[in-house]
Amino acid sequence: RVILGDFVTTEDGTGIVHTAPTFGADDYKAAKSAKPEVPPLLVPDKNGNKVPLVDLKGKFIDDIGMISGKYVKNEYYEEDKIPEKSIDVEIAIKLKEKNLAFRVEKYSHSYPHCWRTDKPILYYPMESWFIKVSDLSERMFNLNKEINWKPNSTGEGRFGNWLKSANDWNLSRSRFWGVPLPIWANEDNSEYKIIGSVEELINEINISIKYGNMKSNPFASFEIGNMLDENYDNIDLHKDIVDKIILSTSKGSPMKREKDIIDVWFESGAMPYAQIHYPFENKDLIDKQINFPADFIAEGVDQTRGWFYT
């Protein structure tokens, strides 16, 4: 089947590209907008969840014929286990044998590699947490018209066009260093708790102690409302600490924190509020628009889609 993709040009290549809506963002958008829609290639796992044909280790899943259990890239194998033919060569041969390939040839092209391991990177669909920006894009677009931009073309053009087609914001980042997502879920993801303050977290830990999911409260010595440095020595909200905190559902089942951290741009956007400890202090400065919005901002044009957008 052939579908339209506006990111394909006649300037480079053939003007035709293969599409993998399961693994590529542009491919997914093109497949989603096609009529009828081209669904991503997903199959149910042993728990009934829809998963791609490739697992998180870069191997094809079981029960899909000749490619089952094989790595997508030869570089993923241990040195003494690298097969003579890579999986793409095996597939090409099979397509030729079945007379399903119009043409097969080798060519060199660039491919993203991990800077640490020097191995090929595999794009993979992951579960993430989003801010539903698409519900707010029209309001943001209209509010942007009230800003006195200099030059005006930046506000109406570059930034205005960005807001008009703003996508939902993926907050999740699969890293270690950063602000942990304050979201806890039970094993089957039927119940979530989103923590909005240190006080709320301390209270939830105390509830978990009653259910037997926590033995003690690591932040018991922290005094809510005490802003002295010595008090903040009694609390540590980094990932390696909060990942050990088990909260409890309404029925007492354990809940673990979502493993990801928050996109650093979210922190940047929180600056006007966080710098004055809003909403825990100085509420009038924000609620009565004394400190925010700003009267004047001078910033590089690159930050219109970065910090200023957040």
Which residues fall in each region the model found?
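Non-cofactor substrate-recognition interfaces
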Residues: 1-310
